[in-house]
Amino acid sequence: MEKMNNIAGITPENELDEMFDDSVVGAVGYTTYWGILPLVTKNPQICPVSENTVKCRLL
């Protein structure tokens, strides 16, 4: 019975962990992306040339 309880207890947690990890990584990546780009606009030399520079200025 203990093994079955462990399996029953671990499986949902693992699924939740995976969902949680995905959402956290996505949120952190998104926040980092939009948090760093505005900083980059203050340092145009860091901004890549051409299209990317235009995108930086738009932000």
UniProtKB/Swiss-Prot annotation:
Look up the record and report any one GO term of the cellular component aspect. extracellular region
Per the UniProt record, the lineage of the source organism begins with: Bacteria, Bacillati, Bacillota, Clostridia, Eubacteriales
Q: Does the keyword Secreted apply?
A: yes
Q: What is this protein called?
A: Lantipeptide Flvbeta.f
Residue ranges the record assigns to the propeptide: 1-27
Protein modification: Contains DL-beta-methyllanthionine, when coepressed in E.coli with the flavecin synthetase FlvM2.
Major localisation: secreted
Which gene holds the coding sequence for this protein? FlvA2.f
Domain of life from the UniProt record: Bacteria
Q: Which UniProt keywords apply?
A: Secreted, Thioether bond
Modified positions (2,3-didehydrobutyrine) in chain numbering: T31, T32
The UniProt record lists the Beta-methyllanthionine (Thr-Cys) crosslink at: T41-C47, T53-C56
Spell out the subcellular localization from the entry: Secreted
Function recorded in the entry: Lanthionine-containing peptide that does probably not show antibacterial activity, since its analog [+7]Flvbeta.f does not show antibacterial activity against M.luteus. Also does not show antibiotic activity when tested with [Del2]Flvalpha.a, an analog of Flvalpha.a, which is encoded by the same operon than Flvbeta.f. The bactericidal activity of lantibiotics is based on depolarization of energized bacterial cytoplasmic membranes, initiated by the formation of aqueous transmembrane pores.
Organism annotation? Ruminococcus flavefaciens
